[in-house]
Amino acid sequence: MATRLGEKLHELRKQRGLTLEKLAELAGLSKSYLWELEDRESQRPSAEKLTALADALGVAASYFLEEDIRAPEERHLDEAFFRGYQKLEPDAKEQLRKILSTFKKNS
């Protein structure tokens, strides 16, 4: 079973369209080490290896330590949506809540 870090690493690698081999090359790590990070419970990379992975994937190393598993792009979209929502007039907010509740009922 993978760790939260392993899940994040796997998702981000897939979103970037990278194979284990290509990410290993970019980060200067072995393919087998990356596989273990993604798929094993007990792996704890050093700060240097975590930084190399973050650099290769174009994220801050702190991304791997955060609880939120969503990719940075998805989090930014959610934050932008919320900022836009906060600027709406009360009537528009109510309409949007009704629309969202319809989606929730249908899912």
Q: Which functions belong to the PLM regions below?
A:
Residues M1-Q15:
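A short, Lys/Arg-rich alpha-helix, primarily the initiator
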Residues K8, T19, S46-K49, A60:
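Residues that mark the N-terminal boundary/hinge immediately upstream of a DNA-recognition element
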Residues G17-L37, A52:
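Short alpha-helical DNA-recognition segment
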Residues G28, E48-Y63:
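DNA major-groove recognition helix of helix-turn-helix/homeodomain DNA-binding modules
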Residues G28-P45, E66-R70:
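Recognition helix of helix-turn-helix/homeodomain-like DNA-binding domains
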Residues I69-S107:
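Interfacial/linker helices and their anchor residues that mediate assembly or domain coupling
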